[in-house]
């Protein structure tokens, strides 16, 4: 399944991107993959398409102490994380 989520940022997009790169091995172990991410022009909000086995898996992963700490240190307001919508079908042109 895929979801579209958003989270508020206090340090801009670059630290958030680096955090996701650093956490990629942990995400892969948990079966979670970031498909796409983008920010608003002010870089205080990121929008992310995430692929996972189920929504509970993502919640459990995101609430792990080390993951929440890494997200917070990168400027993500963990409490602001919001699932905008599950994604049914999608199209990504190559």
Please give the residue ranges for each predicted region.
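Short S/T/G/P-rich N-terminal loop/turn motif that feeds into the first structured element of a domain
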Residues: 1-68, 73-94
